[in-house]
Amino acid sequence: MAPRRRKAKRRRHTLRSECKDKCKCHVQCYVSPRKRRRKLKPQGDDDINTTHQQQAALTEEQRREEVEEEGEERERRGEEEREGEGGEEGEGREEAEEEEAEEKEAEEEEAEEAEEEAEEEEAEEAEAEEEEAEEEEAEEEEAEEAEEEEAEEAEEEAEEEEAEEEAEEEAEEAEEAEEEAEEEAEEAEEAEEAEEAEEEAEEAEEEAEEAEEEAEEAEEAEEAEEAEEEAEEAEEEEEEAGPSTPRLPHYKVVGQKPSTQPGGVPKLCLKMQPQHRSRLPKGKQSHDKVPKKYQARNKFFSQAAPSVLDLSPKSWCWVVDFWGPTDALYRLSRSLSFPGAVSSGIQTFPKGPHATGPWVYFITVYCRTFQTAKEVIKAQKKYEKKYPRSAKLKASLGKFSKSLPIE
């Protein structure tokens, strides 16, 4: 363990003369140097003139005290000299003369100091007069500025009055325009009423036609019900007669549909028999044919993902998804059939066997290079800027397909 050096104990001064006002041993006698050199400063709202007067008054009091002390010392010395040296009167006279001369010199010095103080007071008065003159000039300038501001305010008021008059004129013009607009609106309402009357007449004609069609449908329905009742009666008669051959199934296989997963089992396409006992709701039925212009699109919706999924993911690692309505996605997929990019079939989100709607349709575009994917996205952005109303592929993407980098 390293030896520790003891601190030397501080010696406390016993006498005040040893401190010499430099330490705090005698606290009751200590005066800090900051207080010793602090000068008299104006306090509160006092100005510098009152401060000078206070300083001058203090110096005069000090002088009086000094003069009184000197007089007392002289008297004491005179008494001592008279007691000790009675025979030396000549010397006493000389000393008295010297003292008188010193007193005269002191009085002359006091007179000179009084003159200097008077000169200082005169200089201070002159400075005060100059300050008053400057204040008067400043007041005159302020008065001139106030007059200028009043003149400017008067001008602004005049401008405001003119603006109010203009606003009133504009309001009158606006009222006239409103009256004209009301007249035009009344004319337009009259024209609309005439159109509504025509539409009501047309609707009445359509209702009459619909009533006729409903009457015809009711007759057909009655005939169909009668036919069904006859068929049921015939079946009941057959059942009563005895066991018959097994019934044909209600559905028949008309083709195969590829699986949605690669390498999956193909699904069977079933078609409902035209004659069956189960009743379907009115409207489209399962055996209705798809119009020719939608056949290719219907095939596209049911097709599987492209064979690009079986390839290595490194060569087709750049993927771009496009969302939107089915018809727009169909046209986009047709336009992306070139070597640089391949699009998948229509897909739905959310996926899964137990997923519930609403369905969102999208296609995935697999690009071979990053540059191709970049060009596809760039073309999409260009299409959004050029056709802002169909920015989210709500309209047909034929214009968009023209801007793609098809080789």
From Swiss-Prot:
Top-level taxon in the UniProt lineage: Viruses
A GO molecular function held by the record: DNA binding
GO cellular component, one term: host cell nucleus
Name of a matching Pfam family: LANA1_DNA-bd
Record's compositionally biased regions (Acidic residues): 81-241
Region (Disordered): 34-268
Keywords attached to this entry: Early protein
Family to which the UniProt record says this protein belongs: Belongs to the herpesviridae ICP22 family.
Protein name: Transcriptional regulator ICP22 homolog
Species whose genome carries this gene: Saimiriine herpesvirus 2 (strain 11) (SaHV-2)
Encoding gene, per UniProt annotation: 73
